[in-house]
Design a protein with these regions (language model features):
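Extracellular glycan-recognition regions
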Residues: 1-185
Length: 185
């Protein structure tokens, strides 16, 4: 092999170090702690603000929580958004939407053997006004397709939320998809 033990990007510069020791010459920067957004907590904390809004996308992440955390399925502003969360107190998951400031919340029971405090995979597929919700790689229990959950023409961005300030998120992926709202096959 090539015996490379460090490959790092610092800003837009790639650094590749070979086998190193305490006296090896070269640039050896100290690693930094990972950060998310870096903008501090606001009403929209956890929203992916630096990405392109869309009406068709896939957003998925792992979430480890004791309850009170989940994903923001759609965010335009504080009065126009949708949350998919896990609720340990009621052993359920929910879809909470605000459209024009009007709130709607639907809750669905989780299986009896659902474990809290371990990673669960949440996947949101948005196509226009339709949201499809997947939990641990299968359709969310109770209901997983919400045909008119959000306004079809209102672009937005996804994100994560944590009401308990103790949840962990891993491997968030945001992929803008083909907007087929106006096409019928």
């Amino acid at each position: 092999g090539q015996y490379i033990n460090r490959v790092q990007f610092f800003d837009k510069t790639l650094f590749v170090d070979g086998i190193t020791g305490p006296r090896t010459a070269g640039y050896h920067p100290e690693p930094s702690m990972p950060t998310f957004a870096g903008k501090g907590e606001t009403a929209s904390f956890g929203v992916l603000k630096e990405v392109q809004p869309s009406v068709a996308y896939l957003f998925e992440t792992g979430v480890k929580t004791e309850g009170g955390a989940g994903v923001i399925a759609w965010w335009k502003d504080a009065d126009n958004c949708a949350y998919v969360g896990l609720d340990a107190e009621n052993r359920s998951w929910y879809l909470r939407t605000l459209v024009g400031g009007k709130e709607n919340k639907e809750s669905y029971a989780l299986p009896e053997d659902f474990h809290w405090g371990v990673y669960h995979h949440l996947r949101i597929e948005r196509n226009g006004g339709c949201l499809k919700i997947w939990l641990d790689e299968i359709p969310a229990p109770g209901r997983h397709v919400f045909a008119e959950a959000v306004p079809a023409e209102e672009a937005g961005v996804p994100g994560v939320f944590d009401e308990t300030k103790s949840a962990l998120f891993e491997g968030a992926t945001y992929t803008i998809g083909f907007d087929d709202v106006h096409f019928q096959l």
